[in-house]
Amino acid sequence: MRLRRNYKGASQLNHQAKLFRSIKTIVDFDDVMVHQAKDYFHDYVKKGIILTLDFEAYKWQTTNEYANISFLFNINRFQYKRVYEPLFGIEYETFVDYLKSFIVLSMDQHVLISLQSFLRDIKRLVKETKQNILEDVYNIKITSPTLCIDFFSSLPCYETLIMNQFLEQLDNLITIQYELKPRQQRQLAQFQSYFAFNDILKDYWEQQLPDEERLFYYPLYLWWQITAVVPLRPREFLLTQRDCLFEKNDKYYLTLRRNNLKGKEKGVSHKIAEDYYLTTYEIPEKLALTIQHYLDLTKGLASTKLDTLFVTETHYKRWERRTGINNRFLTYTNLNTILKYFFNEVVSERYGYQVYYLNPPNRLKDNEINFIHIGDTRHIAMINLIAEGSSPVTAMLLAGHDNVTTSSHYFSNLSQFIECRSYQVYRKLTSSQTTYEISKTQRKYTIGKAYV
């Protein structure tokens, strides 16, 4: 399979990506976005897809020509004001407008049934959250955590610690749902996507890129290089300290923060010094130089309040915005935004791939790829560890699990991973134009805890 760059964009996808780009290129919901959504709403009315004439209506009727699908916006007002309004800082009526806007602006990417299920997820989340939003989310039936993440991460609310932990809990649900499905849950198509994403990112990174563009995508590149090898949780990666790299005896070492909390309680974090410990890993020189290059490029920029590896100025500069006064660290929301931009601007437009965000096929064609989620690399790293010969106990320790049984869920798809990798090696042997690889694990690492 030839790895193709299409810098003019993929014409066959342009009509599909129009609305999706519009929702992504606006960092947060605002009045302009709602107005745009209302324009699209009326366009869908003219096309006969939305049968309700009024955007403000309590209930929308839509049709896909096979069946009528209704959207009932009866969000529990009392529960929203009690739990979610203090968290989001968004009034009830405005929240409903944002929810309607998100659905309209997502209609070119998702079928109506999927969006109806998403709306029901939001209603269940609001209605069934009792006391602790971070714990309750695990007990609430969520069918479309991916869409929930996209929606909540677009809300113009202050990025509190609880908000980011809430998004991570939803990300965890994606992995949990994979494990609850039959054994074929991660089919070859998903592993094909990992290999294809690796190829695209590698090829893109080797291009001559403007510093501003490279800096915007730098966190994504290091996320893939590090967390696809070391099974980190997203927040562990994002809280990597600025002074994380050192050299000793001609070898390079990277210090990472690991969560000291276990099970469902891991989402309840109050003080980094108490909830995280430092662990050091030996890393290849190439990765060390890549991290050092980022440190050099951002040397003169304002550090975050938590003095993390990643600064935020280069992120918000993309939209000509200044970093807020509460510049704690580059958040899960920020990284998720970068990932979505990469899939839209690079994977789809530059390389001409068709991206499946939901309901992917069992096997992909050469120009197709599934969307990858932030939490996926933890799964990849666990499989990679076992595939490279590490013991289940080692995988358990590196993942921060209490027992091997928990870890085994992550590498239960090893056979499919090996099958896919064998398939890609075969493709490599039969065509020298493309190589597939997932970075090999480093054999040397330190498990010892050094509390911060």
Q: Model-predicted segments: where are they?
A:
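Charge-rich, intrinsically disordered N-terminal extensions
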Residues: 1-185, 225
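Extended accessory and catalytic-adjacent subdomains in large enzymes
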Residues: 177-226, 230-452
